[in-house]
Swiss-Prot record:
Cited Pfam families: Ribosomal_S16
Similarity remark: Belongs to the bacterial ribosomal protein bS16 family.
GO CC list: cytoplasm; small ribosomal subunit
GO BP term, pick one: translation
Record-given protein name: Small ribosomal subunit protein bS16
SUPFAM superfamilies per the UniProt record, alphabetical: Ribosomal protein S16 (SSF54565)
Organism this protein belongs to: Streptococcus gordonii (strain Challis / ATCC 35105 / BCRC 15272 / CH1 / DL1 / V288)
Gene Ontology molecular function terms on file: structural constituent of ribosome
Keywords assigned by UniProt, alphabetized: Ribonucleoprotein, Ribosomal protein
Taxonomy, superkingdom: Bacteria
Length: 90
C-alpha cells in the first residue's frame, strides 16, 4: 500500500480550505484517509498552516510520500529540514 500525504479540499464554493491527510494513494482525493495531520488555509494573507509535526515526521520516516503542494508547505514550515537532519545526522 503506497501512502501519500496530500490535501483534501473542504469549505464551500470559492472559499476553500484544506486538510493535510495521510491516505492510500489509490483512494479518491476527498475519500478515505488514514489520519489528519494538519490544515492549510490559502485565503488568509499569510496562508495559515497548522501541523502536527511529530505525526508528519513519523509518517515520513515510515515512507509516506508527500504530494508536490504538501512538499512545498512542509518545506516552508521547516519540517522537511528536520526530517533531512534526523535522517542523515547518524
Amino acid at each position: 500500500m503506497a501512502v501519500k500525504i496530500r490535501l483534501t479540499r473542504m469549505g464551500s464554493k470559492k472559499k476553500p480550505y484544506y486538510r493535510i491527510n495521510v491516505a492510500d494513494s489509490r483512494s479518491p482525493r476527498d475519500g478515505r484517509f488514514i489520519e489528519t495531520v494538519g490544515t492549510y488555509n490559502p485565503l488568509v494573507a499569510e496562508n495559515q498552516v497548522t501541523l502536527k509535526e511529530d505525526r508528519v515526521l513519523a509518517w515520513l520516516e515510515n515512507g509516506a510520500q508527500p504530494s508536490d503542494t504538501v512538499r512545498n508547505i512542509l518545506s516552508k514550515e521547516g519540517v522537511l529540514k528536520k526530517f533531512h537532519d534526523s535522517k542523515y545526522s547518524k
